[in-house]
Amino acid sequence: MTSFLIASNILLWLAFLGVTVVMLGLMRQVGLLHERSSPMGAMITDHGPDIGDAAPEFELPDFFGRPVRIGGAEAQGRQTLLMFTAPSCPVCDKLFPIIKSIGRAEGINVVMISDGAPEEHRRFLDSHELGEMRYVVSAEAGMAFQVGKIPYGVLLDGQGIIRAKGLTNTREHLESLLEADRTGFASLQQYMASRKKQAA
């Protein structure tokens, strides 16, 4: 009986040591993955005007008939965030209050640009308070910027120059557009790549 207890105790300790080795290996792998994965900003997925180019210029009416100017110098020199969305896009719907709060907090103009049937836009606007934002229905603007996926953001400086752009599915993606402009890099990915080169 005693030899059975000794053998089971030895087996238990061997199993414990095995689990410990496996856990240490897993912790190391998680650490390596964490180190390799950098923050992801808004991904540039279009083939439209490049960062540093002048944005295409438009004079369009918003959904309510008021004139909206896209591109070119802004009268007060403020930045403009163009958000390409759709009333049927669930991610756009979720981002709407975030876009509104970032626009207000950063003091930038926000122009929501969409296309589709007027009834869809009316339903969307009936359930969302625009505040200072403008809402434009224009397939032409989306084609000029060659937007293929939504929600897509384009940040213009006060002179109408594209400073940052990319697919914006989260608050972090939206904030990365502003951060890319502040740091002078075209995208967060470009910024992280330059940091890796400096570290090497």
From Swiss-Prot:
GO CC aspect terms: membrane
Alphabetical list of Pfam families matching this protein: AhpC-TSA
Keywords, alphabetical: Membrane, Transmembrane, Transmembrane helix
Transmembrane segments: 4-24
GO BP terms, alphabetized: methylamine metabolic process
Listed InterPro entries: AhpC/TSA, MeN_DH_accessory, Thioredoxin-like_sf, Thioredoxin_domain, Thioredoxin_ResA/DsbE_sf
Key word Magnesium present: no
Pathway: One-carbon metabolism; methylamine degradation
Range of residues in the leader sequence: none
Locations listed in the record: Membrane
Record-annotated disulphide pairs: none
Domain Thioredoxin: 49-183
Keyword Transport in annotation: no
Topology relative to the membrane: Single-pass membrane protein
Gene3D superfamilies: Glutaredoxin
SUPFAM superfamilies linked to this entry: Thioredoxin-like (SSF52833)
UniProt GO MF annotations: antioxidant activity; oxidoreductase activity
Protein task: May be specifically involved in the processing, transport, and/or maturation of the MADH beta-subunit.
NCBIfam families with a match to the protein in the record: MauD
Protein name: Methylamine utilization protein MauD
Lineage of producing organism: Bacteria, Pseudomonadati, Pseudomonadota, Alphaproteobacteria, Rhodobacterales
